[in-house]
Amino acid sequence: MDAKKAIFNRRTIHFFENKKVSENIIKDAIEAANQAPCHRSTFPWRFYSVSLKKRMQILDLAIEIKLKKKQINENAENIIKEKYLNPSHLLITSQILDSNLNIQKEDYAACSCAIQNLSISLASDGVFSKWSTGAITKNPKTYEIIDINSKKEEIIGFIWIGYGKNLPKITRPLIDQIYKEI
């Protein structure tokens, strides 16, 4: 699939089939992510492929966080379990932190480009993803589970990867709403 078609086919998916994505597709997507532009050649992105054991620990933490906000019934808990366990892969994406706040901002933009490249590469192989940045990505226990030093790296998202259920139809703004010649 050419790049433009992959860009147009890329979608954020919220529900995944319980079907495995090949490691070759994942590795190709990481290679694509690593081609992202970055100012000053900092290459600030890091990707962690989360094992099932670690994913179960993160799932337990997600339920714990949810229970602090409100009671959840068995059905809601099953939906959370499906969300965490059905995707083929969970990648945790982090950014190497720089002491200079301007460089940190540039590096976040570079990490965003890397995630977009990853998503487009996956889409070119008929695989979908979701970049999530919820409370669990900022929780100190997540850093402990994944063994990330929060003084050196910041988790900027979970990337859920897999084959999608119920592909969404997106209505995008018209080009004249987002683009002007001046």
Predicted regions and their residues:
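C-terminal helix-cap and adjacent tail motif
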Residues: 3-12, 151-182
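Short, surface-exposed loop/helix-turn segments at secondary-structure junctions
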Residues: 62-72, 102-106, 144-147
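Structural motif
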Residues: 88-91, 157
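N-terminal amphipathic, basic helical "cap/leader" segment at the start of enzyme domains
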Residues: 1-87, 182
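Small-aliphatic-rich amphipathic alpha-helix that forms the alpha element of a beta-alpha
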Residues: 33, 91, 97-145
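Short, charged/polar surface micro-motifs in flexible loops or helix N-caps
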Residues: 52-57, 63-64, 97-99, 140, ...
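Arginine/glycine-rich "motif VI" loop of SF2 helicases in the C-terminal RecA-like domain
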Residues: 39, 123-124, 151
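Short beta-strand segments
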Residues: 93-94, 160
